[in-house]
Amino acid sequence: MSERLPQRREVHPEERVRNIWERERDTWQWTSIRVPEEILQRWLAMLRSGRNRNKVYREMQKWMSIHPKAPVIRPCGCRLCNPGWET
């Protein structure tokens, strides 16, 4: 018997970009309601400058891996509920 390796399906470049945005959005939604206020404000300040987006995303992923069972400490992580967004 010869076993065949599972075939990877072709991923269209537009789909790859969409998946990146969805993954970033999901990461933000999970962490923004769980991280302490100081960390959230630091991330928001870094995002305001615009060049630190990847660094913030990596820090969010690292925080998620270190604190997988972090409790929800704020009801929402949106711009209206977080004064650090400056909207």
Swiss-Prot record:
Annotated localization: Virion; Host nucleus
Pfam families, A to Z: Lentiviral_Tat
Placement of sequence motif Nuclear localization signal: 48-55
Assigned keywords, A-Z: Cell cycle, Host nucleus, Virion
UniProt-listed InterPro entries: Lentiviral_Vpr-like
Location, primary (coarse class): virion
Motif (Nuclear export signal): 40-47
GO cellular component, one term: host cell nucleus
Function noted in UniProt: Seems to function as a Vpr-like protein, since it mediates host cell cycle arrest in G2 phase. Cell cycle arrest creates a favorable environment for maximizing viral expression and production.
Protein name: Probable Vpr-like protein
Source species of the chain: Caprine arthritis encephalitis virus (strain 63) (CAEV-63)
Gene expressing this chain: tat
